[in-house]
Amino acid sequence: MILVIGLGNPGKEYQYTRHNIGFIAIEKIANQYNSSFSIKKKFNCEIAETISDGQKIIFIKPTTYMNLSGKSVISVKTYYNIQSAKIFVIHDDIDLETGRIKFKTGGGNGGHNGLKSIDGVIGNNYNRIRVGVGRPQNNQDVADYVLNNFLKSEYETALQAIDRIANNFDLILENKLEEFKNKIV
C-alpha cells in the first residue's frame, strides 16, 4: 500500500496557482488509474483509492490550507497504518525552475509550509516529488508569487512535468524509485 499526497490549498481561487501544482498532479495521476476523489471529513481531505497490480494506492488532497496539511497526512497514515517509506508527497518548489522535477527521500522542508506541517507530525523520512515553479522576480514576495496563477507558458511547462510524473508512476508501484527519479528529469 502506498499513500500519495498532492499539496495545495482548497478553493477555486487557488486552483491554478503555483502552490497547487501538487493538487493538479495528483488529479492527473488518480485519473489515469480511474480513481475519483470524494471528501472524507474525518481525514480532513479528499481521498481516492484504487488497486493496481494488487497494490492499494491511496491518493489524498488535504482540505486544510497548506500549513495544516499534516493533519490529513497523520490521520490517513494512522488509519491505514502506512509506513513513511511508502508515502509520496507531490509539491511545488521555488528552488527549481518551472517544469523541473526532483525526487528525494527525506531531507529538509526548504521553508515549504506544507512540508513543515507534515514533518511536524510524521518526521521527514518520506518521499518527495518536487515540481519546480520558479522563483519570484523583482523582489516579489514569495507568498504572493506561489499564490498567483501560473502564466500561460509556465502552466504548459508545468503540465508537461506532470505528464512525466504520471507516465512513469508505475515505477513507484514497482518500487523502482531510482529509475523513476531518472525518468522524470
From Swiss-Prot:
Chain positions of site Stabilizes the basic form of H active site to accept a proton: 92
Highest taxon of source: Bacteria
Binding site for tRNA: 14, 65, 67, 113
Chain positions of site Discriminates between blocked and unblocked aminoacyl-tRNA: 9
GO biological process: protein quality control for misfolded or incompletely synthesized proteins; rescue of stalled ribosome
Record's keyword terms, sorted: Cytoplasm, Hydrolase, RNA-binding, tRNA-binding
UniProt catalytic activity: an N-acyl-L-alpha-aminoacyl-tRNA + H2O = an N-acyl-L-amino acid + a tRNA + H(+)
Keyword Isomerase: no
GO CC annotation, single: cytoplasm
This enzyme's EC code(s): 3.1.1.29
Localisation: Cytoplasm
GO MF term (any one): tRNA binding
Keyword tRNA-binding: yes
Active site residues of this protein: 19 (proton acceptor)
Family, as annotated: Belongs to the PTH family.
Subunit and interaction comment: Monomer.
Function as written in the Swiss-Prot or TrEMBL entry: Hydrolyzes ribosome-free peptidyl-tRNAs (with 1 or more amino acids incorporated), which drop off the ribosome during protein synthesis, or as a result of ribosome stalling. Catalyzes the release of premature peptidyl moieties from peptidyl-tRNA molecules trapped in stalled 50S ribosomal subunits, and thus maintains levels of free tRNAs and 50S ribosomes.
Full protein name: Peptidyl-tRNA hydrolase
Organism of derivation: Rickettsia felis (strain ATCC VR-1525 / URRWXCal2) (Rickettsia azadi)
